[in-house]
Each structure stands twice: as structure tokens, then as C-alpha cells.
Design a protein with these regions (language model features):
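Conserved ABC transporter NBD signature motif
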Residues: 60-72, 428-436, 443-444
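Conserved ABC ATPase signature
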Residues: 129-133, 501-505
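Conserved ABC ATPase "signature" region
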Residues: 96, 100, 107-125, 468, ...
């Protein structure tokens, strides 16, 4: 078609014998936000390199603006995974340097500088060094540098990895505004919740395009629905339902089976996964599956609080399709040699809690209620006149997964470093594994695992050398080291590659090895600081399966993440804003706390509607999701007519609207913004 600005026909790219891209076909229209998703090594970055004109294809045809990609480079902005900012230059100096490279006139530079600095809310910080910016601000500056030449096409390779949810939403609002000006945007992202904002999405796997469509088309093609099941007996319920699914698979392959399960138990269950205080079950027919689940729970005498039917997410689509292609990571049991963190502790279990008058009727299974592993009281940390952590109170039990969430600079990493003894607090008290005094002792550190934001691996050592080093640091017995190392290699899919230099691994693979290094010694307490940043959805699911396994064996786990869909897997969580803990609770409790309703509107001229409503409402209350508008209203009965009137007075037609549940990201942004508005 003439209107298509990107045309790809039978594109292939080989690196020696490795075929990275295998005969793909794609067309992308002007002004479209097009998402490219896939596991690590799927071929996304190679495709971006070819589109940007920095790499030649092995075969096939690629046209960008009806030119060869190399000839279209003046009209293409490209933001790589590791965007190239000069950290010792200010925002203004970075912008001026980039404008000089692109030969932008002074007049055009000043016009574009004023426009985009205001759009990205960076005008107040123009003299700040790039090295002193938060992750979200660096990402906005890098985007500005890519926009300086007013490109017609913008290529963004995982631009929001490691960026907090508030900044990510602001970033996507900027992208929507740019697309409304006619710029075509192609974006690769490991965050499938944000990929749902794209007009169309392509799923790439092992160099091939498996599926292309809108979010609605991809969901419909799946032909499945999702049940959210809440129960106190999470572990037993998940195990029972997973076994039921496996029996179903066996019966489909073999007409007769010796397993004790009836046909009605197995027809509809496709996938089962724990998400914090609930189970997510992917099913063929919601009504029939709900009846089956209730029957299984009744037969096993399991607690059942609630079942809700919801639409599948893009992650459900992604994981199901890759599972059909046989690419699900193998689950290998951890070679555990000692009891879990809480086993045998005096006062643990339900009876110990009841004797102390504590509540046992909530989302954690009774078996996981044990003594407190981590406790902080009035914790404070000052750096000169700056208070990074302000009077934080925290309790985490053995067997619990606790999520510590907050925007960049909220104080999460500082809090973790204090709790695990790497930083001295300015004030407050800490208890770690029962120790209150010497938190730096070698004996205590061998009972703790820590995976930092910056990989704790040595790039110039091989994978095997790194793992052997950490076995020594953590005192893993010599007799079991080989077994533990073999487990890490097998879990990471690196058997036979253990002599590769760690620096040669992609970021997602490094994360897996770093996690393995942090748990080989079977810690009682595990600190994970953004462990899945940049990791693809399949690997992320494997991470959380392992995290849940360690928690169920008694390990206390504190995890930070910017990906709030995965934060739903935590039993409890706390939100930090500007160094303060502003709320704590289970994912369900926090979502239930939100005032008002989240309204989804199908309307004409989505960008114009967003711009208009942001002048009437606080800007954080309005966000574009694909071709829909999401609006947070505190009093929907009175505000919806007002919103419709505002839009219709500007000749913007509202086709339909409905109330939808708050996601954890919606809740997080609402809490952060309301706290800021209240001046806390």
C-alpha cells in the first residue's frame, strides 16, 4: 500500500550460521504506534538495526519512507537499549550537541527545545547534569535527542526498562502526542501491560513473526477467558489445579489414563499461576470452568473466597502462544540441602500467632506464618541535609514475599541497603533474622541473599567462575557446589556455555545468573532489587516460580520492581513516596482502597480528547490506552456527564464508556499523585 511508511518483505539476517531473523513480513502505517514483543533473542533488536539503516539485511526487501533504510536515516530517530547520553553534560548541552550533529538551525533548535522540554516536563532542569537525572528523566532526555531532527519514524528499543510506573506512563503520554503529529513509532518492550497501549502488536519468536493484530484481535484469537480465584489455600489449590491440567494433557495424548480425575475436571483449565493473594486460571469456557473449579475445591475441602471472570491479558496471549511453540522454560527443582528459613522456629505457625493474638485469616497460607524475619522501626537515613528515608516501619515474616514499590528516588534501594547491613541508618532500629546488633557479621551475611539493581556479576569472569566465586563468598559446602552450579546453569539454559564471559550475555540472561548466584547458599532472607528488569515475560514467569518456591520453603523475600503487573505476585507490599511509607497491604487491599472509579471511554480523536481533559482534570487522571481513554473520577455519577459535555462541545463523540477495575499501576499512580497533591 502506498500509505505504508515501513514495508518489510521476506527479511532475513544471518550471523554466520545463526539465523537471527527468518523471512519476516510487516507493514506499518503513518502515525501508528506499533509494538514488537518477544523473548530475549527473538530478533527484535536485529530488526531495529536493519530498519535504522545501521545494518544490512542478508536477504529480503526493506523500504522505509519508500527508500532503503540507509537512505532514510535523516528521517529516522533511533533510541537504542543503551541510549547514548553524555552524563557529564547538562540537559541543554546534550540537546545542543545533538542538534549540531543533525545540523539543525538555531531558530529551529530553539523552537523545538522549548516545545519538547515543556512536553516532557524537563524545562525546570535544563542546567542539571545528565548523570544526576533519575532513570525516567534520562529516558525523556534520550527521547528528546532522538526527536531533535523531527523524524518521521521513531524506533524505540526497550526505552522504559528500569523506569518507574509514573515516568513510564508520562513517557507513553508523550509518545501518544508525538504519534498524533503524524510520527510513526515502532517500540520494543518487555512490559506487556504497556505494549497494550500500541495500536497494533507483533509477537516475534526465534526470528519469526508469529502473530500481528490489535490487542482486541490478539485476545479474541486466543479464544480463552481468565478466572481470578481467591483462597487461603493458595499452595495446595495451585498444586491441585496444575496436576489437573497435566492429567488433562495426558488424557488428550492417551485416551486412557490411570490418574484419578474425571473428564469434567480437565476440560477447560489451560494455565494456572499464583499472583500474590490469588490464582489466575486461563480457561476455555468461563461458566463451565468456574463450576469445575468449585467442584475441585469442594472435593479437596479447600477454602474458596471468591471467583471473578476477567479478560485475558496480553501476557496471557504471549505465554500461551510461546507454550504452543514449545518454548516454556523447564522447571527444575532447587537442590535443597537444609531446612527452609522458618522451619523449626519457636513460636512459628498458626498456633504461635494465635497465642500472640495475631490474625491468621488472610491471604497467606497458615503454614507460612512464622517469626518475623525483617523488622524496622522508625528507620531514617540522611545524606547531609537530604532525608532519603523518613521514619519507615516494616515487618516481613518468614515465608512471605513483600514488595517495596515506589518511583525512582523514593528511597527503596537505600532502605534495602540499610536492612541488609550495607548502610548504617541515621536513626531507628532493625532486626534481621533475629539479630539486632552486628548486622555486618559474616555469619549473618551467609544467611542472607542479595541481588542488587546493578548486576553483582563480574563481566571479565566466565559464568562458571562467577558462580564458583559466590559459592566461596557464601560458604556453600564444597560437596554440594557442583550440584548448585549445575542447577543454575540448567535453570538459565546455559548448560555447555558456562565458560562464556559473563559480559557477553544479554541483560536478561545476566539477571538469571545473578539470581542463581544469590540463592545457591539457601538464604533465610532474600533481598531482590529489581530482579526482572529487562527480562522477557517467559523468563519473568520462571523467576517468579522460583521466588514462590523459596518463599514456600520458608525464605523471607523483599523485592522491588517497576513492573506492577508482576508485583501482584507479592503477598503484601508497601508504597514509598519521597522516603516515606504511605500505604501497605495485599494487592487486593490496595486496589480496593482507591476512591472513585476508573472509566474507559471509546471516543473519536483520542489525542485531542486527552489534551482537552487534561486542562480540566489533573493530568495524571487521563491516559491513552491504544484507541481508548482511561479517566480516574472520584465522583463518577456527577463527573461523567461533565466529561461528556466537555468532549461533545468540542465535537468529540463519545461512542461508549464503562467502569473497569483499577490495576495495581492505576492504584500506585493514584496514591503517589494524591500524596504529592496533599503535600505530604
Amino acid at each position: 500500500m502506498k500509505d505504508e511508511v515501513i514495508q518489510i518483505r521476506n527479511l532475513s539476517k544471518c550471523y554466520g550460521k545463526l539465523v537471527a531473523v527468518k523471512g519476516i513480513d510487516l507493514t506499518i502505517a503513518p502515525g501508528e504506534i506499533f509494538g514488537l514483543i518477544g523473548a530475549d533473542g527473538a530478533g527484535k533488536t536485529t530488526t531495529f538495526h536493519i530498519l535504522a539503516g545501521v545494518m544490512e539485511a542478508t536477504s529480503g526487501e526493506v523500504r522505509v519512507l519508500d527508500k532503503k533504510p540507509r537512505d532514510a536515516r535523516l528521517y529516522t530517530g533511533y533510541l537504542t537499549q543503551k541510549f547514548s547520553l553524555y552524563l557529564d553534560l547538562s540537559i541543554d548541552e546534550n540537546l545542543r550537541y545533538t542538534a549540531g550533529l543533525r545540523q539543525i538551525s538555531e531558530k529551529l533548535y530553539q523552537e523545538r527545545r522549548a516545545k519538547y522540554l515543556k512536553l516532557m516536563d524537563l524545562d525546570r532542569f535544563s542546567d542539571r547534569l545528565a548523570g544526576r537525572l533519575s532513570g525516567g528523566m534520562k529516558q525523556k532526555l534520550a527521547l528528546w535527542c532522538a526527536l531533535i531532527s523531527r523524524p518521521k519514524i521513531l524506533l524505540l528499543d526497550e526505552p522504559t526498562t528500569g523506569v518507574d510506573p509514573v515516568s513510564r506512563r508520562e513517557f507513553w503520554d508523550v509518545l501518544a502526542a508525538i504519534a498524533a503529529e503524524g510520527v510513526t513509532i515502532v517500540v520494543a518492550t518487555p512490559y506487556l501491560d504497556e505494549a497494550e497501549r500500541c495500536n497494533r502488536i507483533a509477537l516475534m519468536h526465534e526470528g519469526e513473526i508469529q502473530q500481528v493484530g490489535t490487542l482486541a484481535q490478539l485476545r479474541d484469537s486466543l479464544g480463552l477467558q481468565r478466572l481470578e480465584v481467591r483462597t487461603k489455600d493458595l499452595e495446595t489449590a495451585e498444586k491441585t489445579l496444575v496436576e489437573t491440567r497435566h492429567v488433562a494433557s495426558g488424557q488428550q495424548r492417551n485416551e486412557r489414563s490411570s490418574q484419578q480425575a474425571t473428564k469434567t475436571d480437565i476440560t477447560d483449565i489451560i494455565d494456572v499461576q499464583t499472583f500474590g493473594d490469588r490464582l489466575d486460571i486461563l480457561v476455555k469456557h468461563a461458566d463451565r470452568a468456574e463450576a469445575e473449579v468449585r467442584k475441585i475445591f469442594a472435593r479437596q475441602k479447600l477454602d474458596l473466597k471468591d471467583i471473578q471472570v476477567t479478560a485475558p491479558t496480553l501476557e496471557n496471549v504471549f505465554v500461551t502462544r510461546l507454550r504452543e511453540l514449545g518454548d516454556e522454560p523447564e522447571s527444575i527443582p532447587f537442590p535443597r540441602l537444609k531446612s527452609g528459613g522458618a522451619e523449626g522456629r519457636r513460636g512459628g505457625g498458626a498456633e504461635g500467632l494465635r497465642s500472640r493474638g495475631e490474625n491468621t485469616d488472610n491471604q497467606l497460607s497458615i503454614a507460612n506464618y512464622q517469626d518475623i524475619a525483617i523488622a524496622a522501626n522508625s528507620l531514617r537515613k540522611d545524606f547531609g541535609n537530604f532525608q532519603a528515608v523518613k521514619n519507615v516501619d516494616l515487618e516481613i515474616r518468614y515465608g512471605e514475599i513483600y514488595g517495596l514499590l515506589g518511583a525512582n528516588g523514593a528511597g527503596k534501594t537505600t532502605t534495602i541497603k540499610i536492612l541488609c547491613g550495607l548502610l548504617e541508618p541515621t536513626a531507628g532500629s532493625i532486626s534481621l533474622a533475629g539479630e539486632t546488633n552486628n548486622l555486618r557479621s559474616g555469619e549473618l551475611r551467609r544467611r542472607i541473599g542479595y541481588m542488587s539493581q546493578k548486576f553483582t556479576l563480574y563481566d571479565d569472569l566466565s559464568i562458571l567462575q562467577n558462580l564458583e566465586f559466590y559459592c566461596g563468598v557464601y560458604g556453600v559446602p564444597a560437596r554440594s557446589r557442583r550440584q548448585k552450579i549445575d542447577w543454575v546453569l540448567a535453570t538459565c539454559g546455559l548448560v555447555g556455555k558456562e565458560n562464556m564471559l559473563t559480559g557477553q550475555l544479554p541483560g536478561g540472561w545476566k539477571q538469571r545468573v545473578a539470581f542463581g548466584a544469590a540463592v545457591m547458599h539457601e538464604p533465610e532472607i532474600l533481598f531482590l532489587d529489581e530482579p526482572t528488569s529487562g527480562v522477557d515475560p517467559l523468563a519473568r514467569r520462571q523467576f517468579w516460580r522460583l521466588i514462590n518456591d523459596f518463599a514456600r520453603s520458608g525464605t523471607a523475600i523483599l523485592v522491588t520492581t517497576h513492573y506492577l503487573e508482576e508485583a501482584e505476585q507479592c503477598n503484601r507490599m508497601g508504597f514509598m513516596v519521597a522516603g516515606e511509607m504511605v500505604t501497605q497491604g495485599s494487592p487486593s487491599e490496595i486496589k480496593a482502597m482507591q476512591p472513585g472509579q476508573l472509566i474507559e471511554m471509546a471516543i473519536d480523536r483520542t489525542q485531542d480528547a486527552s489534551n482537552l481533559l487534561k486542562t480540566e482534570l489533573a493530568s495524571w487522571r487521563v491516559s491513552i490506552f491504544g484507541d481508548r481513554l482511561h479517566i480516574v473520577l472520584d465522583n463518577p455519577e456527577s463527573e461523567i456527564p461533565q466529561v461528556r459535555s466537555i468532549l461533545e462541545n468540542s465535537n468529540i463523540q463519545v461512542h461508549s464508556w464503562r467502569s473497569i477495575p483499577f490495576s495495581l499501576e492505576d492504584s500506585f499512580i493514584g496514591i503517589v499523585q494524591r500524596t504529592s497533591e496533599n503535600g505530604k
